[in-house]
């Protein structure tokens, strides 16, 4: 099992959903950065379960930084975060141990770990571990923000309902990002918020679940981040986004829409306006895998939560018998509104790692004449 990622900055994720605690270690952070614990708490609150549209498993999610920080500043050594699991109900899972939940990692975990995996609450595969990602991602976002780089996401669509997309106008986009970052249910159009909540509540009442698409925007990035081919900006960010449970699709800019465009429509013409920029942004601020200074726009597809309360056909892995399965326990009818801060967090980590690569090279290069 590979639980770590990163080049200049690495993070290692550990723990299980129903274990005593979950945690994450960030290694390679610069020394001397003042960490805003209140901002970490605010970001954690965006991920918390709320009302009828989320799981009834409510955790305190108190973030304990046990190394790598002293007197509120990063020390430059490995920073480890621990979050205790205080509200587990493992008996909800013992009743159907071995019965494979459709859409979950139960079968694949059995095949990979030969039954030694902690299956309770999904174990290490659980979305519970994203709490650690949000805590660590908050620190990464704070460092990026100190450099003028800001990230924000909103629910672009949920089931058949759609929000207003992020604006192509930079000033309005900046305003939209700051506004959605203050919201628990992140939509630009507050009117559609209530319609979306009603759809989630309806699906929950039917014992079903919903998915949708998140739109993420990053502004303030300098040109020149990323590497050709294997460490392109798209490669790094999509790798990290796909590590978020329930993500099934990632696209940048026009994405699959390019298939219906001509080159004359898809190309972003350059012009000079105090700096070189593009007149349009179909390519989402990335050319050749490297940032061009325009906003990065990402679309992430989140599948409907696989834990539904309808009876489903399955197999008992232990007895090798066909069975009917009805899942018990506490589950989300939709995770879009909670996943948005998780996507922001993994994107922040990837960008900070790329940013540190650029800083390592830039001072060694003279100006081209």
Task: Describe the predicted segments one by one.
Residues 1-369:
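Generic N-terminal targeting/processing segments that precede catalytic cores or assembly contacts
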């Amino acid at each position: 099992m590979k639980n770590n990622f990163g080049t200049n900055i690495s993070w290692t994720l550990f723990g299980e959903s129903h274990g005593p605690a979950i945690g994450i270690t960030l290694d390679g952070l610069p020394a001397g950065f003042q960490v805003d614990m209140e901002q970490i708490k605010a970001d954690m609150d965006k991920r918390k379960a709320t009302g009828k549209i989320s799981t009834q498993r409510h955790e305190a999610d108190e973030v304990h930084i046990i190394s790598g920080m002293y007197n509120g500043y990063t020390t430059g050594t490995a920073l480890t975060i621990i979050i205790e699991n205080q509200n587990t109900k493992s008996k909800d899972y013992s009743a159907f141990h071995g019965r494979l939940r459709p859409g979950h990692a139960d079968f694949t975990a059995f095949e990979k770990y030969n039954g030694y995996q902690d299956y309770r609450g999904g174990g290490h595969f659980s979305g519970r571990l994203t709490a650690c990602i949000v805590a660590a991602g908050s620190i990464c976002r704070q460092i990026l923000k100190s450099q003028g780089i800001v990230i924000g996401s909103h629910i672009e669509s949920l089931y058949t309902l759609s929000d207003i997309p992020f604006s192509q106008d930079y000033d309005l986009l900046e305003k939209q990002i700051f506004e959605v970052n203050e919201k628990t249910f992140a939509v630009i159009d507050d009117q559609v918020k209530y319609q979306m909540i009603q759809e989630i509540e309806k699906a929950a009442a039917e014992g079903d679940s919903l998915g949708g698409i998140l739109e993420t925007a990053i502004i303030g990035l300098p040109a020149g981040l990323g590497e050709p081919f294997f460490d392109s900006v798209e490669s790094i960010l999509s790798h990290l986004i796909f590590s978020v449970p329930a993500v099934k699709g990632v696209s940048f800019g026009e994405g699959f829409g390019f298939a219906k465009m001509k080159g004359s429509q898809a190309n972003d013409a350059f012009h000079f306006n105090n700096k070189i920029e593009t007149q349009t942004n179909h390519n989402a601020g990335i050319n050749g895998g490297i940032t061009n200074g325009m906003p990065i726009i990402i679309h992430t597809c989140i599948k409907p939560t696989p834990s539904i309360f309808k009876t489903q056909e399955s197999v008992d892995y232990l007895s090798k018998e066909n069975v009917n399965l009805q899942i018990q326990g506490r589950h989300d009818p939709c995770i879009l509104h909670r996943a948005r801060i998780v996507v922001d967090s993994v994107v922040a980590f990837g960008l900070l790692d790329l940013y540190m690569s650029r800083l390592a090279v830039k001072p060694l290069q003279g100006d081209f004449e």
